[in-house]
Amino acid sequence: MLSGLLWMQSYGAYVVLLQDDFGWSKTMLAGAFALTRIESGILGPIQGWLVDKYGPRIILRIGIVIFGLGFILFSRIDSILTFYLTFAMIAVGSSLGGFATLMVSIVNWFNQHRAKAISFSHLGYSLGGLAVPLVILCLEGYGWRFTAMLSGLIDLAMGLPLVQMVKHRPSETGDQVDGEPEKLSSTAKSEVSVFDANRDFTARQAMRTSSFWLISTGHACALLVVSSVMVHVVPHLTEGLGYSLSQAGLVVALMTGCQMLGQLAGGYLGDKFNKRFICICCMVAHAIGLMTIAYASHYSMVLGFALLHGLAWGIRGPLMVALRADYFGPSSFGTIMGFSSLIVMFGMSGGPIVAGLLADIYGNYELGFTVLAIGAFVGSFCFLAATPPKAPARVAM
């Protein structure tokens, strides 16, 4: 929630104010976001291995401290170099103290209800997005420097105590996966254990499957849209469509509300129906939504974008984790996600750069958003082809 509220979903508003104060181009501001996503992608395999080995709590604690200090230093920047350096700190802190680290714990705690559990965990991020108008009010009333300083202090004050609640595996507290210790007979328990063991891939085994690469590429294509919206939708609404910063913040809040509905629906749908088919539908919705906002000529089109993109993002996001966990098992999940991030980072970093560069050249976001929408549509075919891999070979005992 803190990462979504203070940074990821609020960054578009910072872009507008930083442009006004320093005169930096959209490409330069998008470049900072892109470089930090590359940095986080490279960090992914190491981070995943550390979480698998030492558990999520210590990694979360380190990440929260780096994130908070990064925001405090960000409030003092006076050049593009110091902006990039502090932004890199924020990104590293967000990676270590956020999504990927927490998902390792959730995947280990849930099996039958995994998609629902992941969906509920994503609600925190969405709740942060709903509060973006409050961040924008603070930005407009007190300036971006004060808001950044306050954000860093809030992160440290709230994040560190919350970390104490996180446990790596149910065995640490004497619990069972899915919290149901007595519902299965000893025979059924044995059968489930054998099944789970057969589905457990090492990182090396997972990377030998086509599904690993197809899911990662499809995820990257989705993030072409998600990342470009994070960075550029507020500038597009204010500069291109004539909305005020506060009105743009309300659009972000509406989009986030739709995202929350999507997450709740996605958890149920993901546990009941084919996850790949759901992901394909979401990729198409991402593409249509971005095309709608690119050529919006009426507020109804802006609302349509918020609905389509928010629902697609909310439904698809948790399934990216659940699908990998279903295919490759929980034992090496952190490491597998880490190596996958090396591919996913190209979408997360490329989207803002493409949109920003083409906006600087042509004076609007229409072409950039169109190109990225096509990329999302192409990504739907990756999920179509990502069939479940065969269980890895085991040495006979």
PLM segments and residue spans:
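Helix-loop-helix hairpin linking two adjacent transmembrane segments in secondary transporters
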Residues: Y125-S171
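Central cavity-lining transmembrane alpha-helices of secondary-active solute carriers
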Residues: A34-Q47, A253-G266
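Hydrophobic core of transmembrane alpha-helices in multi-pass small-molecule transporters
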Residues: T82-G97, M301-G314
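Intracellular juxtamembrane helix-capping segments at the cytosolic ends
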Residues: L18, L96-F110, I315-F328
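Extracytoplasmic gate region of multi-pass secondary transporters
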Residues: Y11-V15, R204-L261, G351
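Structural signature of the two symmetry-related core transmembrane helices
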Residues: I59-I72, F277-M291
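Symmetry-related core transmembrane helices of the 12-TM Major Facilitator Superfamily/SLC fold
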Residues: A148-Q164, L367-A385
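Extracytoplasmic
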Residues: M1-K26, L43, Q47, V132, ...
